[in-house]
Amino acid sequence: MVVDLPRTDPEGWDADRMPEVPIAQTVVWETHVGDFSNDPAGGFPESHRGKYLAFTDLGTTLGGHPDFPTGLSYLKKLGITAVQLMP
């Protein structure tokens, strides 16, 4: 089998750029995909819990309370600049 990799690139692939965060200001968070989004009170759709898809959910909160963000909103509040995902 031969794969034509450029054909697999989604639209805008070549325009995508990594955020420019100086290494001294980089804060890395390591998490398991399941642990990140498994809690039913975390505000994630049930079909996204424990899956990579949960990282696409914006504005999630604990129990619907706006003062307690979850997911990427929580990491942003902490100042996390990079996430290492564990399966």
Give the residues covered by each predicted segment.
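N-terminal structural segment of carbohydrate-active enzymes
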Residues: 1-87
